[in-house]
Each structure stands twice: as structure tokens, then as C-alpha cells.
Amino acid sequence: MVSGSCINVLKKEDLSGRKVLTDYVLKSVTDNYSEEINEDGEIKAKIVSAPNTEKRLIKGSLASASVVAGLAFNKFVSGTPLYRQEQELKRRGVPISRASMSNWMMRCSDDYLKPLYELMKKDIRSCEHIHMDETTVTVLEEKAERTGKNYMWLMCSGKWEEQQMAIYCYHKNREHAFAKEMIGEDYSGKIHCDGYEAYEKFEKATPLGCMAHFRRYVYEAYELDAGSKIKNRTELQEYAKTHEAFGILNHILSEVKYLFECESKYIKDKLTPEEIYTKRQDEQKERLEGLFVYLDEHQTHFTKQSKAGKAIQYGLNQKEKLMNYLNDGEAEISNNRAERSVKPFVMGRKAWLFSNTISGAESSSIYYSLIESAKMNGLDIEAYLTYILSLIHI
């Protein structure tokens, strides 16, 4: 038994908190008023309703800006297809069909987001540096018409551009004409790409190659020639003495590695474009010129159809474009910037697999453009989508 005199009441309270995740329905209440009531208590005038000033995001729909933003975030960022979102919402007591979700997202992209998307496309064409890439996408409506492979094209602004954005555009194929349609036929800036011929058709623009692509092709050949089996530098040197082809590939990779190490140091030292230009002229130009001389002298050591032969030929064919970055401190040595921006689409494609319709693919291109641009600017993606949908639909 505890005596009451032994109990001391502590005046300071211990507070604890928990975060609770919950769904809710925001209801609007409309007040009704009568203008006049007679002596018998009857309404003489008709009922007057207070105006409901809230404008629906989609007429006749319960969808709000945050709901559509959440659906888009789950699909395009988290990689959750609509059928799985439908299952999860049903489990939580919110039965919404995937058809409704799809309709909401497409309506919002067409009615509210597309004008913003078109402005972004216009703005990115004013950038001095752009990066381009393309990747396949399956569109069932196109497949039924046998149009061949369908493509999602990507255009993103250069590292030093004031406006940081990524623009996705769907097109039924990879035809050269669409590159001009997307970028603008009169574009006169710098186009970073992977060697695709479509980007060489611009009379006023300067194409820049991708050293990372060249390195990858050489490394694939290097791996075939026992590269993956060699454990240390000593083994490598011994193997190279007795395998001339391997030694050639190893030398090429070493030279390219040096170039990338220089670029990494410039980033680490936070150099300005002007300083980068000077450093490249002093540290890289002679080495890169020497590398192309080496490629030319040793290309006959490989058959044209071998991986090594194709890799070396790629480098020689791309020589001018691969060297162009030396002439501009804002240019990049590779097109990795575009590849990083297109990767979220590639990863998402593994989850949702295909688009049913052309309009669905075009809608996806709009959402991906806004989402990846938000990422590039350090924004909260879901909050950003909610904000612009709330703002634009008013």
C-alpha cells in the first residue's frame, strides 16, 4: 500500500506526439435563405441560395487538385500504375476506378497543364545549350496501325542555363523531321546528343558528341577481351604485353578516363565557364587530339564488324563533335545530363508498361516534363503539381 503522503505530483507534463495519415472529404455547405415569411408562417418569396464560389477542377467530378497531383506523383514518380492505385484506394474505403483516375489526369493535362507545357517548350528553345535523347514507348493505338516503334523524345536545358527544365515530347517514330519540329528549325545554339544523325540537320546549330557513349562502346569491347577477368594492374600489364588488341583498348580507356577526371576536378573546384575553357585548352586539348591520332593509327588492328572496330569507328566518325566541348566552357563532355533526365521515364515504363492511346502518351509527356523540371529546380513535386493545378483552374 502506498501512502498518499509519499506521492509527489510533478507539475511538468510529458508531451508526446504522433503523425496521422488520413484521407478526408472536403464538403462545401450552401446556405439557403427565404426573402419573406407571412403571418401564417408561409414563405411568400422563393428560396434564395448563397452562391457557391468554389470552382470544380473538373465539372461534375469530386477530384481536387491535391487528388490529381497525388495520382500523378504515384504513377510518374513512385512508379505505381493506376490499377494498383485503384486497389489501394479500394482497400482504404475510397472506391475510384482507374478509368476515372485516367480521365481526371488527362482532363487536367489538357485543360490546365498543356498551356504551361507549351510555354516551357518555347522557353527552352532560347537556351544556348540543350541536351537531347530519345527512348521507346509502346502505344497500343499506334501499334494497331503498325507505325513501328514509338518514341518519347527528351530535351533538357544545359547545366549553366538560367532556366532549368526538361521537356518530353511523344512522337510515333524517330524520324529526323520531328527533331526540327521539337527544337525549332532555326535553332542556333549547341545541341548535345549521342551521335543520332537527326541533330546534324540544323544549319545554324553546333552539335556536340557524347564521350560517355564512346567510352561505353570501347569498354564493351574491352570486357569481351578478358577485361572483366583481370584483377589488378600487374595482371593487366602482363596481359597487354601478349595481347596487342587489349593493350590498345586499355590505352584508349586510360586517355578517356583522364579527360573525365579533369572534368570532375573542375566541378569540385567550382570553376566558372571561363576558367573551365582555359583549363581544357591547357590540360585536355593536346591529349584529346593525340587520342584521335592514336585511333586513326590503330583502327586497322580490328575488323570493322567487331565491337572494338565499331567503337573506334564511332569515335573517328564523331571526332569533330566529340572535340567541340573544348571550345565552350559551358559545354559538357558527355550527354549524361539527358540520360539522367530520361531515366525516370525508362524506370516508370517498367511499371506501367504502355499507354493505351496517343492522347494518353501525350498527357504523360506533359506530366513528366513538369515533374522532371520541378526536380531540377529542387521543388517538392507533389506540392508543386497541387499548387499549379489550384492556381491555373481558378
Task: Set out the residue ranges of the language-model regions.
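Short helix/loop capping segments that flank catalytic or ligand/cofactor-binding pockets
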Residues: L10-K11, G41, V48-P51, V139-E141, ...
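Conserved small/polar residues in nucleotide/adenosyl-binding loops
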Residues: I392-I394
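Short amphipathic alpha-helical "interface-anchor" segments enriched in bulky aromatics
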Residues: Y196, E200, M211, R215-Y219, ...
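Helix-rich, typically C-terminal accessory recognition domains appended to large enzymatic cores
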Residues: L295-A338, V346, K350-A351, T357-Y384, ...
